[in-house]
Every structure is written in C-alpha cells, then in structure tokens.
C-alpha cells in the first residue's frame, strides 16, 4: 500500500472513461443536448438496485445525481484477499472524511456476485468492517450488475482478464456528477491521498469551506 502514491492516483485519472466522455460529448453537433445528459445516457443506466438495508434505489436518480460519490466493485467471497484489504482501506478514508460522508459525499460499493451477496450478506459484511453511515453496499439482478460494471469502466479489453472477478476490485472511481468531474485511483492508495485527490472534485467555495 505504501508504494501506491498520489502520483499513481493522478495518473489513473487520465484513464477514467467517464471523464473522457465529457470531452467527446463537447464535440457533438446537437447543441440542445448537454454534455451532462450525454454522459448520463452513456455511462449511468438508471437500474434498480437493492441496498444492504433492503431498500430499492435507482442508480442515477437516487445514488449519484447531484452528488459527489465514490464507486467501487467487490465481492464478499473474494478469493485473493484484495476485497477485505480494499474495504478496510476505504473505511479509513471514510473516517478521514468524518461526517461529510452521507452529507455531501456518498460512498457506494457494488457486488460482483449478486447471486450470493444478498442484502443480508452485504449488511453483515458492512457491520464486520465497521462501515459508518453514508456508505452503501448494493446488489441487483446479475445482468444489471454486469451492465453497470461495464458502463462504469470496470472492464478490461482482454476477455480472459475481464472474466476474473478479482481484476475489477482494485480501482476506486470518484466523481462530482453535476460538475462532470470523474477520476480514479487504486483502492489501496493511502487514505490521505484519496481524500486529497477527491478535494479537487469540489468547487473553490466548497474547498475553502472544508
């Protein structure tokens, strides 16, 4: 973990396909369609998901619209140990952000194995790691979770690598939906660097206020 630096976070930001989508959409000839609408339609399917507390939510309308968010994929039966380490690291991020999580920053973790990770399983997992308010674990129909994974850019061109669930658990994506600012970094980056990187998602007024 110590070898993952802030420079790595910033380098990965250039690979974030959602951020690149903003650049692509700006060249569209249809001026009546905003870049925000283009990004929403292209990357944010409004799928119905279920939280670890058993509540039905829509991905765009309820989870990310008008919010600053973090997004990552995981599964509770992670074979190689990456998910427990990443979850524990993100718990430290949540503690650094304090009461901002659930107020103006929202954390979301999506399961890669919805057939096993029911809301009850996710609730036990969150409790075991001491996850606080404002961080939601989500499941859904297998086809919907797969579609969401690909739309959000948690995918590899190599089909063999893409088929390995563990290859999708190492990245944390974060963004400011209304400002169309999106980036990514390794989920095992130092918590302080993740928080610092996320601060640049905010407008100057919010940065001064925090």
Task: Give the label of every model feature segment.
Residues 124-169:
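Short, internal strand/loop/helix patches
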Residues 62-83:
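Short active-site neighborhood of thiol/selenol oxidoreductases, capturing the structured segment around
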Residues 19-46:
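N-proximal helix/coil linker or "cap" segments that precede and/or mark the start of modular domains
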Residues 161-210:
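Thiol-/selenol-based redox modules, centered on thioredoxin-like
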Residues 86-108:
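Conserved helix-turn-beta segment immediately C-terminal to the redox Cys motif
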Residues 1-16:
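N-terminal secretory signal peptides and thylakoid transit peptides that target proteins
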Residues 104-117, 134-143:
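Thiol-based oxidoreductase modules, predominantly thioredoxin-like and allied folds used
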Residues 48-68:
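A short beta-strand-turn-helix
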């Amino acid at each position: 973990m110590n070898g993952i630096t802030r420079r790595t976070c910033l380098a990965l930001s250039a690979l974030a396909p959602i951020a690149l989508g903003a650049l692509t959409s700006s060249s569209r000839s249809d001026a009546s369609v905003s870049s925000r609408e283009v990004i929403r339609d292209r990357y944010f399917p409004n799928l119905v998901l279920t939280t670890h507390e058993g509540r039905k939510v829509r991905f765009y309308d309820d989870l990310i619209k008008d919010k600053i968010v973090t997004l990552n994929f995981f599964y509770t039966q992670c074979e190689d140990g990456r998910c427990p380490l990443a979850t524990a690291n993100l718990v430290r991020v949540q503690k650094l952000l304090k009461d901002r999580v659930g107020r103006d920053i929202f954390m979301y973790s999506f399961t890669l194995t919805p057939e096993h990770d029911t809301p009850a399983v996710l609730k036990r997992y969150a409790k075991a790691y001491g996850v606080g308010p404002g961080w939601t674990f989500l499941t859904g129909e297998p086809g919907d979770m797969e579609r969401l994974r690909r739309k959000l850019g948690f995918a590899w061109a190599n089909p063999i690598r893409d088929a390995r669930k563990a290859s999708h658990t190492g990245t944390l994506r974060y963004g400011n939906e209304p400002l169309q600012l999106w980036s990514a970094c390794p989920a095992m980056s130092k918590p302080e660097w993740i928080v610092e990187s996320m601060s640049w998602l905010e407008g100057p007024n919010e940065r001064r206020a925090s």
